[in-house]
Amino acid sequence: MKILHVCSELYPLLKTGGLADVLGALPQAQNQIGLDARFLLPAYPAITTGIPNTQVVAEFDNFAGHVVLRYGEYNGVGIYLIDAPHLYGREGNPYHDAYYNDYGDNYKRFALLGWVGAELATGLDSWWRAEVVHAHDWHAGLCVAYLFNKGKPAKSVFTIHNLAYQGQFSYHHLYEIGLPTGMFHVEGLELFGQISYLKSGLFYSDASTAVSPTYAQEITTPEFAYGLQGLLSGLKAQGRLVGILNGVDENIWHPNVDQYIPHHYKLKYMAGKKKNKAELQAYFNLPQDESALAFVMVTRLTEQKGVDLLIESADEIVKQGGQLMILGSGAPHLEQGIRELAERYPQNIAVKIGYDEALSHLMVAGGDVILVPSRFEPCGLTQLYGLQYGTLPLVRKTGGLADTVVDSTSESIKARTATGFVFESATPEALRHCLQRAFALWQKPRAWAMVRTDAMEQDFSWRKAAEQYRTLYERL
């Protein structure tokens, strides 16, 4: 079965979020189980630098101007690149300029991505024709509208990585992107008087997936649906919206092979974890105290990620003699808030503003607890990394966090199902109480070790997700 993944990011070449991690691993896992999966991406500078050896597949002019379609390989997976420098030849973030202004021609840049995706199902490459087009997030959402307009020459799947980003543009652009005006309708592309690329993906695809079962349920409610609850609940009722959990790329995120950490370890030999903890404490200039419960947080600093909840409850960590290390950047007032915490408690709390891939790995390997107190979280990857590394996740019960972490209660510990700590209300008080429970378990080393073992034995491999996607494709 020939699968074309239409997307806008690819780890490690170009990443703004978890979407890149998914595309960096899923097609490879699918090929390992016998599918024939390829990518389609815009030829951004970061992508072409990483994939220098390509051949021309097609050359044409359309609504977006002159375009060359190239083909190459990356990590053993075939990849098509849309070479249109006037649209994609921009350094840095693929969606906005250095001042965080969205590019004014994004409607055309991502319409072209969708258009080429549909053409690859109708013979644009005479040697390979997609049988299933799998579009990811709003950037690729128009792809399934173009497929629909062509009489659906291939089956289609649309994956929602984050519903908050909808790709909305003026309906005036419809004339410029080669779609009939009849598609601009509430039963089509229209959302709040604009074209919604995300709604296009949902409405016209044969099936949509969310990146966890709980998130698939949550987005049918007004609180999470951003005005799309009617469409989404209808899709769910028809069996056209399902949740499939993301996986962990074990070539990159496994404590026994991780290239970024100084001391490897595995379930049967955990000595390296203690050594990584000491290295992490030294990096952040905190006391190298093995007995201090070390909390880590690697995140975008936004309210969505619950950073404000942590700021208001972090004194609990200090009071109990724990340590807190934070890596991330984001909203200026939250950056300032965590800086002030570190200044107030220099023996217990340390912060690095920015992003550092190597440090993020050391934090996951060296921490005892990884904090993910999100208000909403479609899937979440950091809690999965925590499970893999025996760094117990402390999470809020939402989205993929609810699907992947089992709270440590006396019953669940005894049943050997506990894998972390879970709280429900998005309040500082609820988070504070959960922190207290983590400290209580830390005082029972044997119980802590049991939970850590059960966490590390969880299977969130990409092979498992690849099998679930294959089952979905086969029933379309």
UniProtKB/Swiss-Prot annotation:
Biological processes, Gene Ontology terms: glycogen biosynthetic process
Keywords: Glycogen biosynthesis, Glycosyltransferase, Transferase
Involved pathway(s): Glycan biosynthesis; glycogen biosynthesis
Binding site for ADP-alpha-D-glucose: 15
GO cellular component: cytosol
PANTHER family per the UniProt record, alphabetical: ALPHA AMYLASE DOMAIN-CONTAINING PROTEIN (PTHR45825:SF11), GRANULE-BOUND STARCH SYNTHASE 1, CHLOROPLASTIC/AMYLOPLASTIC (PTHR45825)
Family: Belongs to the glycosyltransferase 1 family. Bacterial/plant glycogen synthase subfamily.
Chain's role: Synthesizes alpha-1,4-glucan chains using ADP-glucose.
Family annotation (HAMAP family): Glycogen_synth
Name the record gives this protein: Glycogen synthase
